[in-house]
Amino acid sequence: MIWPVYYALARGLFSRYPLPPGSMIHLDIEEKNNRCRLLDLAAEHGPVFKAIAWSELWVCIVGLTRCTRFINENKQRIRPVTIDVTRLYAKGFLRQMIGEEHRHYRKPLVVALRDEKVSSLLPQLRPIVDRVLADYARRQSVTEPPLPETLLAALSEISSRQLIRIIFGSPDQSAFSERLFAGYRDLGPHGLVWNQGPRQERAFTALRRMILDEVRDAPGEAGGAVRRLHAMGAFDETMLGHAIMMVEMGRYDLQGFFRWLLRYAGQNPAIIDRIALENETEPAEGNSLARSFVLETFRMDQSERLIRRAEQDIVFDGWLIPRHTKIRLCLWESHKAADHFPEPFAFHPERFRAGDRPADQFSPFGLDEHYCPLAEIAMMLGTLFVRAVAQRYRIESIADGTPLRGAYHWEPSARFTVLLHPRDGHDA
């Protein structure tokens, strides 16, 4: 244990309020071996409990209503925690900004990413999925199934090319798009840029330079959030950093989410057959089966937690949360509430057919003003991906083992991959 833990224990001794219940177990280790460990601890100690993780004191809060109330009651006492990218650009991720600075950058970005602007690009985004998956299917062999790395590379290419088109506006496979695609491979060839060194600094600088040159040389060219931000007068060095890192983090998250979609597609062929025959237009009321499939996948996986740090001592529900404590707002566990989702560990997309759930039941993209600005884009791309797969292929899962805790998210088994069998009338 390091000094923040000793500080917390000392504060607990001298405060009129006790620390939350819970033993000093190493939660980061125990959770890797039991994904339901936090649910077990909440059942034992109640919805607010403490533990040790990564040599720090953590307080976990389960239940979306409770998590939202904690944020609203303590906005001035907590700060979002995320990957530190200030080595790449000074002010860092949008998600770690607070107050007026956060509002200053978030508002124009949300306007630039409005649904109708992105939905108009869907006819250009679908061919990316079709082309990359067709190439993947052509190169597969029944006797030698594709390596997991081959599937990851294909999904990374899809997510990267789609987000480059949405954020930077250049048509896929254009000269500028190809330079950006290569630049992102240099920035994070093996996934999310977690630790930045000289190589990442050089790659980030190269991306920054080519984007600035393109915006300067073709400022009025149609399409892309960056050009809309430039036209609004909201494009500065920090916004450029946000744009670059939104693609970097987004392509990593989408690649992982596409893997989950394929896993559930392989496990539920009858549902995929129904999606293949479904009208692509969303119904006037409720959700299509494809969109419901995406929502249920977010409920089951990938939407896991929000993390905050206590900037000062906090008293919440009678418990002391000392300064420096990390607070984990447990989304994955909250989405397993049986009173809202009967059979919470079963995959049932039908539960979303009547429509999206209210935020006190289901909130995969955040709980406050830091709600993910790419939320509806992720939904659009997930739905597009499911439809593309369902309409053209039957999915055979290979090595669909126990999920594991990855560097940032839970992931399907490291050996998981798929065979794509073309449906009648569709060539690989």
Language-model segments: residues:
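Residue-level recognition of short, solvent-exposed, well-ordered loop/turn junctions
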Residues: 322-323
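Cytochrome P450 heme-thiolate "Cys pocket" and heme-binding signature region
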Residues: 353-414
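Cytochrome P450 catalytic-core helices
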Residues: 251-278, 375-393
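Conserved cytochrome P450 K-helix E-x-x-R motif and the immediately C-terminal K′/meander segment
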Residues: 26-40, 44-46, 282-319
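Conserved cytochrome P450 K-helix/beta-meander segment immediately N-terminal to the heme-binding cysteine loop
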Residues: 330-356, 365
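Cytochrome P450 heme-thiolate monooxygenase catalytic core
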Residues: 118-256
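Cytochrome P450
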Residues: 2-10, 79-83, 91-126, 171-179, ...
